Every structure is written in structure tokens, then in C-alpha cells.
Amino acid sequence: MSDARKLSAMDASFLYLETPEMPMHVGSMAIFRLPDDYKGDFFEEFKAMIASRLHIAPILKARLEKAPLDIDHPSWVEDDQFDIDRHIFRGSLPAPHDRATLERIVGWMHAKLLNRARPLWEFYVFEGMKDREIEIGRAHV
């Protein structure tokens, strides 16, 4: 992403309407059943896979920048301080390691606003469900 790209009125409206009580990002959740003989580190492999594909979607390395005097919609600009470790996190699902616990965590996560000083996306990889890894994503893109 070489030049600033101004948000459309529609995209900017999601930012303007967002409040701490009403986040406007979208979310996803995927539960992966790992093969019985899997010996790898799912988190590290997932992070490496995302990192290897960032060039396909440069917007994932862009942050918001307000217009001078805030007289226009914000723009996406390349984040020179981009660090994938600020966007992909590892967690452990607390006991009792069940679907209800997972749903409570997802609800808590989606209630938090994304940090507008950084590119507006995050992934969390949770371990703790029997032979499964859970990926939870949030994004404003």
C-alpha cells in the first residue's frame, strides 16, 4: 500500500457509529479438529501462514489516519510500525474447556473495541478443547 486511500462514506460510517457499547467490527470463529498424529504447533503455523500472505492484502498492514482538522473521512495509510505479534495472539481456554466457556470468551472479546492506532484486525488462537484449536478473528476491513 503505497498511497493513502480515503475511506468511502459507507466504510467511514461504521467508524462514526461505533461506541464502546456498540462495536462495529465483524467477527469470525473457526474450530479446527487436529489429526490424532499432529505434532506441530498450530499457533506458530497459523501465524506463519498469515504472515506469508500479507502481501496479498496490503490493507492488513494499514492503519487509519485522520484528515487534517478532521474535515474529511479518514484514510488507510501503511503502518511503518506493523508487527504481526500485535495482531495474532495465543490463549488457553479456561476450565471447563467446553462450548459455553468458549462462547463467553467470544462475547467478551467482541465487546472490546479494536485499537485504532493499529491495523484494525486481530486473530486469537485458543488451545484447551480436546484435540481442537479455536481461531477467533475480528476486523474492521
Predicted regions and their residues:
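Non-catalytic N-terminal regions of enzymes
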Residues: 1-139
